């Protein structure tokens, strides 16, 4: 048997004592995948930019801002992927049970 996910699952971003951002776990999987993909595409693009910069000319403040953005987007993307994975496992278990 599988665990029932709450409809709205909080995303822990460490910026508030109580959650502010939530994932709607009942959205279409394709929409959730697109949401995660968008975040990881932005992360990839930011990392491409960082890899092409001459870091000796970059201020510590700017580098911190970019790495914080990458971290936040990656956390959100991973949270969405975790929901997708749980739903995929539930679907597979339901399929196996019906055979």
Named regions from a protein language model:
Residues 1-99:
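Sequence/structural signature of long amphipathic alpha-helices
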């Amino acid at each position: 048997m599988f665990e029932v996910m709450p409809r709205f699952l909080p995303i822990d971003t460490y910026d508030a004592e109580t959650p502010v951002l939530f994932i709607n776990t009942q959205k279409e999987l394709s929409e959730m995948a697109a949401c995660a993909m968008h975040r990881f595409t932005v992360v990839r693009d930011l990392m491409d930019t960082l890899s092409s910069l001459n870091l000796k000319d970059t201020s510590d403040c700017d580098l911190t801002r970019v790495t914080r953005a990458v971290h936040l987007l990656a956390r959100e993307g991973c949270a969405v992927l975790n929901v997708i994975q749980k739903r995929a496992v539930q679907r597979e278990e339901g399929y196996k049970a019906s055979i």
